[in-house]
Swiss-Prot record:
Pfam families: Ribosomal_L13. The gene is rplM. It comes from the Bacteria. It comes from Ruegeria pomeroyi (strain ATCC 700808 / DSM 15171 / DSS-3). This is Large ribosomal subunit protein uL13. GO terms for biological process: negative regulation of translation; translation. GO terms for molecular function: mRNA binding; structural constituent of ribosome. Part of the 50S ribosomal subunit.
Length: 152
């Protein structure tokens, strides 16, 4: 039997809505990355963008375990003495709290052109409102998938 290799005509993209309120960040990012790549489908083909379109709401209410809220992100501006840092807590309380979820998902995908294309299928919103009601997204309840996905 020949190995199945999907063609662009075989790809069926769905819209998935995930509520991130109270969900552990790493577990959420792992589930979202798997959906973006399409590894949950039996027809998965590694070189094709066959994942679903994923909408994540309430990204500002994501749960972070342990002392990871106090861990620093470091970057350099390129200027002398230009080392900068922020904690996850500062980012979540800042203007763009959805960036914590975005970076977690991005770092769970391979670092190639295909994963950059797959990241365009991810939409993250800090609040409950999103402009994708017309796509009729299917709700994926991450909390009920496993009791370890949420932390009280």
């Amino acid at each position: 039997m020949k190995t199945f290799s999907a063609t662009p005509a075989d790809i069926d993209k769905k819209w998935i809505l995930i509520d991130a309120e109270g969900v552990v960040l790493g577990r959420l990012a792992s589930i979202v990355a798997m959906r973006l790549r399409g590894k949950h489908k039996a027809s998965f083909t590694p070189h094709m963008d066959m994942g679903d379109n994923v909408i994540v709401i309430n990204a500002d209410k994501v749960q972070i375990t342990g002392k990871k809220r106090e861990e620093h992100f470091y970057w350099h501006t390129g200027h002398p003495g230009g080392i900068k840092s922020r904690t996850k807590q500062q980012i979540l309380e800042g203007a763009h709290p959805e960036r914590v979820v975005y970076q977690a998902v991005k770092r769970m995908l391979p670092g190639n052109r295909l994963s950059r294309q797959q990241m365009t299928n991810l939409r993250i919103y800090a609040g409950t409102e999103h402009p994708h009601e017309a796509q009729a997204p299917e709700v994926l309840d991450v909390k009920s998938m496993n009791k370890k996905n949420t932390r009280s």
